[in-house]
């Protein structure tokens, strides 16, 4: 890696702008980083003026993080290749569906020894169905290592400077230290683990559970029911990782990327909010996305669809009744008030061996 590490943030939405506050401040303060941080911004017109110009003149992303100043060393760039070409660290923080196209644009245009880190909570569709981890797509396309950062990190609260934790999954200790230095702040505490796939899968699966929590809120079933859905969701997350990503550690689920992110998303995230409105309004998920999310995309329903494809392929739908029911509610195969009947006889209530005991050695 270069003497002075250049950093590029690929994305400038709500979360990308919030993380730019931390990354920009650290790049300016720490001698190992180049002070100037580029941030790729999809060009939009706001009241007739380019968003990149507004950000570079006012140091505020008025569309996605209004009211929060970005460090002046964070420079908005409307051209992806131009923003990324000198980067030693590429921070990917865009909706997951853009990643394959962005990787095509960047192929051969970035430093060959660069590293990436994905802050993207979601999967892409694998060829032939199922899920493809975003970090795997980035590594496969760009031929560079890709770590992940996931945690209980609601963007507006991070931007406010409220205390929280996050988890970096990185298999290379040397890169893990550099990434920790880049993201660590007094209010944003970082734990690095080597269980990268489990960290990333947690970041996507919790969005499915949050939809279930939203259905419970919309049905006004109360806190006990919501707590049960969250707990069963955690058990299905652990079970899913055990089936599809064997060798992961149980301890990872007790980091910020696991149980903490699950809780905060089930109480404060957009998947929960939209799912509650889905019950109370009678509108479709697509209609509510347009009305409520200011151009952002919901991750829970498409993730539930791909997870269901994988479960169906292995004949495991009955072992994951919560994930299965949430998918069927999102696709109108079931009504929201069918949710509780689907989980009343959950395998977790019948079979104490659902969580394989060997993992307990990893606590």
UniProtKB/Swiss-Prot annotation:
Name the family. Answer: Belongs to the NAD-dependent glycerol-3-phosphate dehydrogenase family.
Superkingdom field: Eukaryota
* Name used for this protein in its record: Glycerol-3-phosphate dehydrogenase [NAD(+)], cytoplasmic
- Subunit structure comment from the entry: Homodimer.
EC numbers on record: 1.1.1.8
Q: Where does NAD(+) bind?
A: 11-16, 98, 121, 155, 270, 299
Q: Which residues take part in binding substrate?
A: 121, 270-271
| UniProt keyword terms in alphabetical order | Cytoplasm, NAD, Oxidoreductase
Listed Gene3D superfamilies: N-(1-d-carboxylethyl)-l-norvaline Dehydrogenase, domain 2, NAD(P)-binding Rossmann-like Domain
The active site is formed by 206
